[in-house]
Structure formats: C-alpha cells, structure tokens
Amino acid sequence: MLAKRIIPCLDVKDGQVVKGVQFRNHEIIGDIVPLAQRYAQEGADELVFYDITASSDGRVVDKSWVARVAEVIDIPFCVAGGIKSVEDASQILTFGADKISINSPALADPTLITRLADRYGVQCIVVGIDTWYDTESDSYQVYQFTGDEKRTKATTWQTEDWVKEVQLRGAGEIVLNMMNQDGVRNGYDLRQLQQMRAICHVPLIASGGAGTPDHFLEAFRDADVDGALAASVFHKQIINIGELKKYLSEQGVEIRVC
C-alpha cells in the first residue's frame, strides 16, 4: 500500500501566500519561500502552489518564485495557475516544479489534459476541480475562475461527470477542492469524497475543510483518499505536520513519519 500524503496548499496572489474562506475574503499569510521551507522541514510529503488569479487575469503563474522554491526544498511540489499550453507547462517544469496542475484552462479546453499527459506523462498532470454542493438540487457542480470573486461562475459540468471525463483524457491525479468546506475547518465532505472515490481510478486528493487531526483520519479511513490537502490549519499553526503524521500512524494509517 502506498503511503498517504499530507499536502500543505499555498494560495499565491501578488507574490504572497493568502488564504480565504469559501474562496473569498483572502488575507495575507506571508512570504512564499519561508513558508515552503517550514512545511518541508515539518515533514510535508509535497506542496501545492496555486496562483489563484492567474487564470482569471489571463496570465501564467509567475515563474521567479517557482525557481526559488525549487532551490530550498527537497520534497516534490506542484504548481497551478493559468497553464494553457504545453509550452507554459514546460517552463514551469524547467524551473523546478515536479508536477503541474490545471483547472480553469482544462474546462475551457479539455484537450489540454491529453496534450500535457502525452508530452510529460500522466504522473506529471494533476487536474484541480472546484466543486460546490447545491442544496436545492442535491448535486455537486464544477466552478471556474474561483480565484477571482467577481469572475467565479458555475460551469455546465456536474462534478461526477467531470471526474470521469478528466480521467479519460489523461489526468494522473485529481484534487477535489470542496468549496463549501474551504477554510471553515468543519471537516472534509466525506459523502462527496466517497462518491468520487467510487469512480476515480487515479490518486484522489481531498481539499477543503480540515480543522482537526481527526478530519484527516476520516478522509483517509472513510473515503480512502490518497492525500489530504490543507491550508489554514498549517498556516496558522493550529496543526503541526509532524505531530499530525505521528497521530495518523498511531491510528493505523500508512504514512511516512518524519
């Protein structure tokens, strides 16, 4: 069995790490490189960086900090933000990223997933899915341009259908960003994770809602996700990564303990 992964998420805006609640009202957390170093030292298995306004601004992630991060950490990291072509991806990987993640650009052009997977291999290609639970219809809907409150919009995709589609097109991993839970710290949406796990045959990463060590345990034990991504509990030092991994190991979760 592959070890489960703990993945701090760093949302980047204007060159700094920020964090919002339900993808809104972002506050500045700090500088990118020191935070990346801290998480690597605490025992994170990998890091994810989202340039949250790149797609809505029509630009590609700023590559200067990608190179600086690559110089100071020795764990894998993934970068997302406005990657719309093989050339965009090539530059980010050349600057030191281990994976690239696409979200809104994949919704605009689903063939991008296949082109990237064919060029770099599926192991390099992550698809992020921003999913919102609509109580009236009791359904999960995919959203686009979520880094910009003014441009955020629902797509025509139901989350389950998009999860199936991106796998067919070559996604090597899926990060499910559960918008209702984002930053609230009330736990991951286990029902949604279980539904998507049943149809997901590539690594599935839970994102949105972590507030306690038990929330991570539930995601691994009850939804069988491959990794758990979190931001605010790590940024605000509510949970220490090393202590979290020790707890999970004691509960029987297969995990790399520092």
From Swiss-Prot:
Please give the chief subcellular localization of this protein: cytoplasm
Pathway the protein acts in: Amino-acid biosynthesis; L-histidine biosynthesis; L-histidine from 5-phospho-alpha-D-ribose 1-diphosphate: step 5/9
**GO annotation terms (biological process):** L-histidine biosynthetic process
InterPro entries documented for this protein: Aldolase_TIM (IPR013785), His_biosynth (IPR006062), HisF (IPR004651), IGPS_HisA/HisF (IPR050064), RibuloseP-bd_barrel (IPR011060)
* Group of enzyme by EC: lyase
Q: Which GO terms describe its cellular component?
A: cytoplasm
Q: Which reaction does it catalyse?
A: 5-[(5-phospho-1-deoxy-D-ribulos-1-ylimino)methylamino]-1-(5-phospho-beta-D-ribosyl)imidazole-4-carboxamide + L-glutamine = D-erythro-1-(imidazol-4-yl)glycerol 3-phosphate + 5-amino-1-(5-phospho-beta-D-ribosyl)imidazole-4-carboxamide + L-glutamate + H(+)
> So what EC number does this one have?
4.3.2.10
- What is an example of a GO molecular function annotated in this UniProt entry? imidazoleglycerol-phosphate synthase activity
Quote the subcellular location field of this record: Cytoplasm
Keyword terms of this UniProt record: Amino-acid biosynthesis, Cytoplasm, Histidine biosynthesis, Lyase
Task: Relate the protein's function as given in its record.
Answer: IGPS catalyzes the conversion of PRFAR and glutamine to IGP, AICAR and glutamate. The HisF subunit catalyzes the cyclization activity that produces IGP and AICAR from PRFAR using the ammonia provided by the HisH subunit.
Oligomeric state and interaction partners are given as: Heterodimer of HisH and HisF.
Q: Which family does it belong to?
A: Belongs to the HisA/HisF family.
Name of the protein in question: Imidazole glycerol phosphate synthase subunit HisF
Source species taxonomy: Bacteria, Pseudomonadati, Pseudomonadota, Gammaproteobacteria, Enterobacterales
> Gene encoding it?
hisF
